[in-house]
Structure formats: C-alpha cells, structure tokens
Amino acid sequence: MCHLLKLARLVPTLSLLIGCQVAAPARVQAPPDSAAGEISFRLAGPGGAALLVPIYLNGEGPFEFVLDTGATITCVDQPLAERLNLPEQRGQIGLGAGVGGAGRVRLVGIDSLRLGAAEASGLTACVLDLQQVRAISPDVAGLLGLNFLKEFRVTLDFERNILLLQEAD
C-alpha cells in the first residue's frame, strides 16, 4: 500500500499531457518484415510500476524513457532538450493538464526518435522538468508517449522483459 501511495505522487507528472494541439503527425518507419523488433525493458519504481526503455534521439543515446501510455505526446526532460538543442516548434500550442493543474508547455521538434528498429521522424515533443519522475530512476530523460506508440501494435512480455513493436495493421 505504501508503494502505491508513493507512486501516486508521480501521477501528475507521468500523465501530464492529456491534451495537446500539434500540427502534423510523425512519419514512422518499421523494418520491411513489418516487425519493428524486440526491445528489452526494465521495471523500476515502487513495485516495478514504471517500464523503462532505451531511446535514441537525433542519433544520440541511448536515453532512458518511461513508456507512458497516459501521455498524449512524448516529453523530453529539460536538461536533455537543451543538451540536444532541440528546436522550438513555433506556431504550435501545447496544453498540458494533469492532477496538479493545467497550462502551456514548450513544444520542440525531434528529427528522429528510435526505439529498437522502429523509428519516427518529424516528431513533436514537449519539454518538462522531470525531476519528480527521476524518483523512479535517476537516469529518466523522458516519457515515450502515444504520438509514437499509437503507430504500432505493442506487446509487453513481462516474463522476458521484452517489448515487441509491430507495424499496426
């Protein structure tokens, strides 16, 4: 019970973006055999409640991201966005909402985001201070959201700690 209460404090951050206006969807590429492959993940946080995956942004990484089906778009921690010099998406408005309130968020462009053999280009992401999320793991650098995940059939094999991405039908 105590672990659940600790995790509940992170929910406003992990599920921050439930609404965001963005211009164009990302272009997604999967390998020709339509299977984007198996990716190892690790569980972290109280009771293993967070699933962490290795992400490559603009050819750099890997960076540890939380797989977050509650996030409409992918989010990058502010220090990483600055380090990678991710360009701000002018003319687009990001609206974030969570248990803690609502407000505007900064949106940036990601040229390429790769998870295993699956890659998206032209992805929009928000920039957040993920300090609270780093309670799960000190290396968390972002949240992998639905603007990437929705393009795939996602299978989680908890027995082997494998995430399987397949091109959506």
PLM regions: where:
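Pepsin/retropepsin-fold aspartyl endopeptidases
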Residues: 2-5, 17-169
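Sec-dependent signal peptide recognition
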Residues: 5-13
